[in-house]
Amino acid sequence: MYFTRDPVIETVITSREGYKLSIRNSKHLSQDPFVVEAVEVIRLGGTSFFRNCDHSKPFLVPAADYEVMEVRDAKINLKAVGLDRGVKIVSGREALLKMPRVAPVASVQEESSSSLEEGIIEDPVVATPSPASAAPMSKKEKRKEFKNEKWKEKKKQGRRRNSKEIADAVGSSQDMIDTITEECLQESSPEERDPCERRFALIPPPTRLISEGPEEPKESQPVTAVDLNESLNALVSESCDVIESILADEDTVIFTKESEKSSNETQELSSHSLEEASVHDRISSEE
């Protein structure tokens, strides 16, 4: 937002560590509240307003219709619980967690010292106003100094907290890795010494008892190669023998086409002879 004349900042309300400010509409409770870390109380004429210090999410609401409440931030609690729970589940050894950690602490000290040096370098730059605009810009300078100090303290605290959590997590993970490697080495050392002990297999029981005596070896039958042509010739000869034995039997009767023709001819001849005999009888009787 841009103003033709900057409003008067009455005070700045900030939340404690682990808490946040909730600016809620007292007349319309269904409206979602604004959850911020700091809020400014400004005055325009005779009316007071709440303005967010974080310019990425700006809002300007009348102070008469809104109320400010301090609520606990749930993110910090969840993060702390997750770290503690993860360490307890994985390691389970309190002695390893209590071991001194030298390297992470040194890195934390270096980060804190660098952040302090940056704050010391930035302070004189912000706090050195131009002499020409010293009188009319006094309120702005005070407001900027106050905001910068508050935000610097919060940034330092957040960096220290994050660096401590990272150092604890790195140290615990390093301890767990060391213990796991030691256990793996301890488990692998007996395997390398006695490789034959682990190599075993279940042998089926013998089919004969020792009291029955040794089993005599069976004579292996010689395997001979069979020629296909010889086997076919043998089958043909056997089939011919079977057919000849069937034909040689006296009880069998053979019906062929020639026998059928001869039987038909004999029947025709007998019928002709009968007709001729009947004709001769008639002629003789007439005479």
Swiss-Prot record:
Ranges of biased composition (kind: Basic and acidic residues): 143-152, 273-287
Bias-annotated ranges (Low complexity): 110-136
Chain positions covered by the region annotation Disordered: 109-175, 203-223, 257-287
Biased composition (Basic residues): 153-162
Family: Belongs to the chlamydial CPn_0623/CT_504/TC_0791 family.
Name by which UniProt lists this protein: Uncharacterized protein TC_0791
